[in-house]
């Protein structure tokens, strides 16, 4: 007795072309050897491919419906259109059928974050144990009770974290970064891998703070057994020769002498846009003293038209030695406490 292709796919004899495609998709995924480790999986995978190749082809299906498998393969279906007898022989490579069905793309990509029909996310797929329970089929290929207990969900790999170092000038003005990553991708056979490079474009917005995260969902390595990891870039400030950052404020350290700290001085304060602002200090500069220039800091992330402040801190340089006469003058004029 020949093979019952309809039974193999789990469909009725009058099934539509769309029903045949859906059935093949479910059964091929179910019995793919990379997903199903049972001893019979390879043979079932091959049978499913052969059944689909016959039933999805109108001429083969018509002959099969009339004469069965023996007639299809034995030439009972008349001529092939060129004067010869039509005979069908399965090519023997179910993986080729599998790859062709998925259009040459990654055949497992439905598990890796793309959207499926009906708006359902692929990371909602149930793939461990009974990997195709979401389709309403049991492991033997026939419809099952939808109230049965579902298996566990496919897990996503942990995020891959990269530091993205940016200068204060880039934060001040905003910029575009292009980051090259290499990741593994499944080949159409669903088993082997290739290494693929990709350029990820990051728009650095004005005023972004250190620690800001930019996430590229599921751009990590592909495997048949997990959802690709998210690629995450975390903003990290580069050291600056003049400024330190304090949120949206920037800090400039002015170095002055002890005499200037006591007697007053004038300094030129640089700004982020390359200008300098003159500042006169008449007060005695005490430890921790700051001056503030409003609106000369970094843009606010949520309102880049407004900016933080430029803070001036003072670093007083003390002499290594002073003469005895200078000490006497200081003792005479400086308060004891």
Swiss-Prot record:
Homodimer. The C-terminal section interacts with the C-terminal tail of OPRM1. Also interacts with SDIM1. Residues 2-70 form the J domain. GO terms for cellular component: cytosol; nucleoplasm; plasma membrane; Z disc. GO terms for molecular function: ATPase activator activity; protein-folding chaperone binding; unfolded protein binding. It holds the Pfam family DnaJ. It comes from the Eukaryota. The modification Phosphoserine is found at residues 122, 148. Probable chaperone. Stimulates ATP hydrolysis and the folding of unfolded proteins mediated by HSPA1A/B (in vitro). This is DnaJ homolog subfamily B member 4. The gene is DNAJB4. CDD domains: DnaJ, DnaJ_C. One of its GO terms (biological process) is negative regulation of transcription by RNA polymerase II. It is found in: Cytoplasm; Cell membrane. Keywords: Cell membrane, Chaperone, Cytoplasm, Membrane, Phosphoprotein.
């Amino acid at each position: 007795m020949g093979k019952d292709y309809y039974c193999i796919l789990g469909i009725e004899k009058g099934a539509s072309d769309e029903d045949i495609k859906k059935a093949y998709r479910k059964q091929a995924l179910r019995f793919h050897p990379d997903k199903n480790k049972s001893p019979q999986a390879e043979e079932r995978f091959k049978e499913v491919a052969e059944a689909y190749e016959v039933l999805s082809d109108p001429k083969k299906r018509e002959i099969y419906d009339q004469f069965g498998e023996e007639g299809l393969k034995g030439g009972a279906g008349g001529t092939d259109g060129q004067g010869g007898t039509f005979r069908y022989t399965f090519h023997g490579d179910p993986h080729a059928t599998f790859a062709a069905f998925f259009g040459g793309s990654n055949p497992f990509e439905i598990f890796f974050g793309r959207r499926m029909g009906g708006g359902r996310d692929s990371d909602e797929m149930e793939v461990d144990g009974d990997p195709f329970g979401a389709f309403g089929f049991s492991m033997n290929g026939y419809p099952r009770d939808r109230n049965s207990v579902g298996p566990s969900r496919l897990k996503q790999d942990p995020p891959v974290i990269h530091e993205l170092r940016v200068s204060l000038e880039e934060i001040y003005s905003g910029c575009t970064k292009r980051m090259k990553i290499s990741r593994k991708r499944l080949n159409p056979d669903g088993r082997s891998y290739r290494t693929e490079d990709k350029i990820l474009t990051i728009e650095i917005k004005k005023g972004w703070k250190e620690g800001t995260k930019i996430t590229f969902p599921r751009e990590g390595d592909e495997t048949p057994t997990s959802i690709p990891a998210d690629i995450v870039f975390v903003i990290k400030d580069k050291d600056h020769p003049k400024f330190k950052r304090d949120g949206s404020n920037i800090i400039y350290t002015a170095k002055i002498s002890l005499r200037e700290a006591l007697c007053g001085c004038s300094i030129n304060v640089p700004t982020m846009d390359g200008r300098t602002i003159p500042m006169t200090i008449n007060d005695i500069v005490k430890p921790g003293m700051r001056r503030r220039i409003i609106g000369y800091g970094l843009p606010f992330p949520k309102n880049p038209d407004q900016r933080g402040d430029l803070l001036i801190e003072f670093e007083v340089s003390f002499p290594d030695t002073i003469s005895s006469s200078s000490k006497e003058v200081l003792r005479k004029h400086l308060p004891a406490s």
